[in-house]
Regions:
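Juxtamembrane inter-helical linkers in multi-pass membrane proteins
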Residues: 103-107, 111, 161-193, 275-300, ...
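Extended, low-charge hydrophobic alpha-helical regions
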Residues: 30, 91-115, 119-132, 174, ...
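Juxtamembrane helix-loop transition segments at the membrane interface in multi-pass membrane proteins
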Residues: 98-100, 154-173, 197-214, 235, ...
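Selected transmembrane alpha-helices and immediately adjacent juxtamembrane segments
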Residues: 58-63, 67-155, 247-358, 439-466
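Hydrophobic alpha-helical transmembrane segments of multi-pass integral membrane proteins
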Residues: 133-163, 167-194, 316, 346-380
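Transmembrane helix-loop junctions at the membrane interface of multipass transporters and ion channels
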Residues: 224-250, 426-434, 455-465
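Alpha-helical transmembrane helix bundles of large polytopic membrane transport and channel proteins
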Residues: 1-51
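Membrane-embedded alpha-helical segments of transport systems
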Residues: 189-194, 213-230, 249-262, 366-372, ...
Length: 466
């Protein structure tokens, strides 16, 4: 009886550890492997193939794409090519769209003047709202129209499941679920949608890990900031295709930092607040298929690009108008925006930023897409959003306000690591039904962004590089 009572009192962790010693850790993989080999043997004996090269093509490709040696370099190479094409292909369309909005703004301004509309009304609607919408469309639409279709082509071809297979090993070591790699991949498009995609993870603990760390993957709203900073400062000493290549390399480096941070935070949480044993799952690798290129491009453009752009415009319009009001309502000789900026400036300087940058991130909480327009508007003495059609003009504006390469680096790091946008936070609350976890999803990346930028600033100054 005493022995029976003692066994009843055994802690759950001990029982799990004891059960794991009774079988190999990869027994599930062994079972699935045996099933696959038996099925292949039966097919080989009973089915005749006229084209054996096509039969084994998937296996030959998988040996390369899922190789422990070549899998990750190929993955980074493909990602670099996507970013290179996105950056190189988006420049001209962005300039054309910006010029169109500048032309339209002139006509609208003439119409307001002819109608003798009040200056404040023209300021809110044209210099604030209309320019804000124009900035968002010109900066976001061309990259999205290139990035999303290419990403969709990889998905339809069957490559993304191979990426998940490669990442599964890393996520398992960090205490997370392998399916988190799929939700992380979706975060490249939109973190808010990626939060909903975490439903594919059955374990509540591992699903919470995916929710809390998904923000470290840069979404489409943060690509413009990363690309702009990388091209203006990190690739400043290069021209032509080399500048584009360096810019793409820096952006890929930021993505790698985001993935490392995802794995690190997942590991820490799995050892502290979200303790548990990682669950196993079998990832089915579909055969490689030739994608329907035109259909994929059209669907990706309409379903993803236009949807994200529409959401950005809906959020950017009122935010741009609000920023114009803050910049043009004065108490004495100082605008409300400048009071806010001056309040933030001492703390922001510790992070290698300034009050304008930190204010732009805070006011850009509704959507990351509007951080750049708000930042540019805040720097201008006129208090109006500027057109984003001349990168040299933008760089000169930054340099006049004391920017260095360290400022650009910390702006990129803060953009990569800081709190989720408003839409993502709403989705997190809907999925978790918990104010506590929603707050933690805001606080964890924010604290990490502050620590990382602070340390990078202190290190660079200590080394005397700035």
């Amino acid at each position: 009886m005493e022995s029976h009572s003692a066994s009843k009192a055994l802690p759950l962790d001990y029982i799990i550890q004891h059960a794991q010693t009774l079988s190999k850790e990869d027994i599930r993989d062994d079972i699935v492997g045996d099933i696959y080999r038996t099925s292949a043997s039966i097919c080989k004996e009973s089915v005749q193939y006229t084209n054996t090269d096509k039969l084994y093509r998937s296996e030959k490709l998988d040996k390369i794409f899922t190789s422990p040696i070549w899998g990750f370099p190929i993955m980074l190479g493909i990602l670099s090519i996507i970013f290179y094409l996105t950056i190189a292909g988006a420049n001209v369309p962005s300039d054309m769209i910006a010029e169109f909005f500048g032309w339209a703004e002139g006509y609208l301004t003439s119409w307001f003047q002819a109608a003798r509309a009040p200056e404040w009304l023209h300021g809110i609607l044209i210099l604030g709202l209309f320019r804000g919408i124009g900035a968002v469309i010109s900066v976001m639409l061309p990259p999205m129209a290139i990035f999303f279709p290419m990403f969709a082509l990889l998905e339809n071809y069957g490559y993304l499941p191979r990426v998940a297979f490669n990442m599964d090993r890393l996520f398992k070591r960090s205490g997370a679920h392998g399916k988190q790699s799929l939700t992380m991949a979706m975060g490249f498009g939109c973190n808010a949608a990626a939060i909903m995609s975490t439903r594919i993870i059955e374990s509540p603990r591992e699903r919470m890990l995916a929710i809390l760390t998904n923000n470290f993957v840069p979404c489409n709203g943060r690509w413009p900031m990363l690309i702009l900073m990388a091209s203006l400062f990190m690739a400043a000493g290069y021209t032509g295709s080399m500048q584009t290549l360096v810019t793409a390399g820096v952006v890929v480096g930021m993505v790698v930092i985001g993935v490392i941070m995802t794995l690190t935070v997942s590991w820490v949480l799995s050892k502290t607040a979200l303790k548990g044993v990682p669950t196993h799952y079998t990832l089915e690798l579909p055969p490689y298929r030739k994608p329907k290129v035109w259909n994929t491009i059209v669907r990706a453009t309409l379903d993803k690009s236009i949807y994200v752009l529409k959401r950005a415009i809906v959020v950017a319009a009122p935010a741009a108008a609000l920023t114009w009001l803050l910049a043009n309502i004065f108490i004495g000789d100082t605008s409300l925006l400048m009071y806010f900026v001056n309040f933030l400036d001492p703390f922001a300087k510790m992070l290698g930023l300034d009050g304008f940058i930190l204010a732009a991130f805070i006011l850009g909480l509704p959507a990351n897409e509007i951080v750049i327009p708000i930042l540019l508007m805040s720097y201008l003495s006129t208090g109006a959003l500027t057109e984003i059609d001349d990168f040299n003009q933008i760089k000169n504006l930054f340099l006049e306000n004391g920017w260095t390469w360290l400022t650009a680096l910390n702006t990129m790091l803060f953009s990569l690591l800081h709190f989720p946008c408003g839409t993502t936070l709403v989705n997190i609350y809907k999925e978790t039904k918990s104010a506590k976890w929603t707050f933690l999803s805001f606080a964890i990346p924010t604290v990490i962004a502050i620590i990382v930028t602070f340390l990078s600033t202190q290190l660079v100054h200590w080394l005397g590089l700035v």
